[in-house]
Structures are given as C-alpha cells and as structure tokens.
Amino acid sequence: MNTSQDTIYAQAYENISDFQFDEKVAGVFNDMIRRSVPGYGQIINTLGDFANQYVTTDSNIYDLGCSLGAATLSIRRHIDNRNCKIIAVDNSESMIQRCRENLSAYVSETPVDLVCGDIRDIKIENASMVVLNFTMQFLAPKDRDSLLSNIYKGLRPGGILVLSEKLNFEDESIQSLLVDLHLDFKRANGYSELEISQKRSSLEHVMKPDTLEQHGARLKKQGFKHFNVWFQCFNFASMVAIK
C-alpha cells in the first residue's frame, strides 16, 4: 500500500477547511491512520481472524467505508473456498481508485465488488460479517440508528458486526487523560504541535464520536443481544456485536 508520509498539516494555514477524504488524503492515508490511530494494525489483522471464524459459505461480507482496502484484504486472506463475495464501499472516488489498485496486487478467488457510494444507501443482504472501521463517527448522529438497523436486518443469524470507533467518555477526568495519551502517541509518531492542532480543527465539525454507552444502547435497540469491546487503546476501541 501507499507509504507516502502525511505532511498535509505541516504548514500553517490561515483558514482550516473541514477534513475530507480527497486525493490528498488518499495519497497518504496509510501513513496517516497508522500514526494517528493506536492499535490500527492489530485491528486490521484481527478482522481476518473474525472472518475465519464467522464468515459462512455462500454469504456476503460488507466493508463499509473501505478506504484503501486494508480490512477487505485482511478478510479476504482468510475466507478462500467459501464461495463468498465482499462488497467494499466508500464515498471517495480517490479512495476507491487506490483500493482497486491495492486489491489487484493480491490474487484471490474471493471476488470484491467496489462501490463508490454512500454507505447509507447500501442494502445489506445475506451478510455473515459487516465491518465499520472508523466510519460511523463521520456520519451525522441522526443517521446512525438507521444504518445499524439496515445492518442488523441484513445479517444472517450468528453473523457479526465489527465496529471500530474513536470514543468520548462521560467522565471528564478519563476523557482528559485518554485524549492526552493519544496526543502523546501522535507526538511520538512524529506529528508536530502545528499538525496536531490543525488536524483537530479540520475534524471538529465532521467527526462526532460517541461514548461506549451510546454505542451499546444503539446496538441493543436494533436487536443485537451480544455486544462487547474486544480491543481498546486510549480513546479508540473496536467492538463486536453478534446477531
């Protein structure tokens, strides 16, 4: 995958525009997310383990917000000989184009349908696994219930949703502590104070994290009876919900 270094916010801007997954971001996304999201590599690798255990024959797998295809690739490596199909969706044409290039570098008998579109418009059908990897936090909060409803209805019994998100915490002391630890993580990965500040400003209006309690209540409302966090580092977590 592309390993160009993320320097998007390294120079000072007079006006910071809202963050978007454009060509500039797509070109450095692999570097950006691994230097910004603690545990990202572990989450991606473990998606393959989830797929190995839960993906069933003749079913669909959905990667909603697929970006460069890291989750799709991890899943695909573990599900040969199951006659499945992966539907990978992203609303960024730049991401889809680079995802297509990344997927073509690896041979697999499992087909991948790449869709450039809004994940809210995708009907989930005959799914044994659905992945939302740091995607739902960019949706308007009012749209999150309907998205999960669509996913739940389209999952086979015993199918899973893996939901990875940045978190907020109701306890202000915990919130402050984990935010500070995350900022130290970014500094340790080479981001300057200017880059951190400008990136934070660009995300302010487009990324709206929930608390774990909000996630749990939303999943329970849609019908998921089994739900828990399987990975957390600072204010980033990945959850699994079983239908």
From Swiss-Prot:
Taxonomic lineage: Bacteria, Pseudomonadati, Pseudomonadota, Gammaproteobacteria, Alteromonadales
CDD domains: AdoMet_MTases
Pfam families found in the cross-reference section: Methyltransf_25
Name of the featured protein: Carboxy-S-adenosyl-L-methionine synthase
MF-aspect GO terms: carboxyl- or carbamoyltransferase activity; S-adenosyl-L-methionine binding
Quaternary structure annotation from Swiss-Prot or TrEMBL: Homodimer.
Binding-site positions, S-adenosyl-L-methionine: 40, 65-67, 90-91, 118-119, 133, 200
Gene3D superfamilies noted in UniProt: Vaccinia Virus protein VP39 (3.40.50.150)
Source organism: Shewanella sediminis (strain HAW-EB3)
Reaction equation(s) it catalyzes: prephenate + S-adenosyl-L-methionine = carboxy-S-adenosyl-L-methionine + 3-phenylpyruvate + H2O
Cross-referenced InterPro entries: CmoA, Methyltransf_25, SAM-dependent_MTases_sf
Entry function: Catalyzes the conversion of S-adenosyl-L-methionine (SAM) to carboxy-S-adenosyl-L-methionine (Cx-SAM).
Keywords annotated in UniProt: S-adenosyl-L-methionine, Transferase
GO biological process, one term: tRNA wobble uridine modification
EC number: 2.1.3.-
Family to which this protein belongs: Belongs to the class I-like SAM-binding methyltransferase superfamily. Cx-SAM synthase family.
PANTHER family hit by this protein: CARBOXY-S-ADENOSYL-L-METHIONINE SYNTHASE, TRANS-ACONITATE 2-METHYLTRANSFERASE-RELATED
The gene coding this protein: cmoA
The keyword DNA-binding is assigned to this record: no
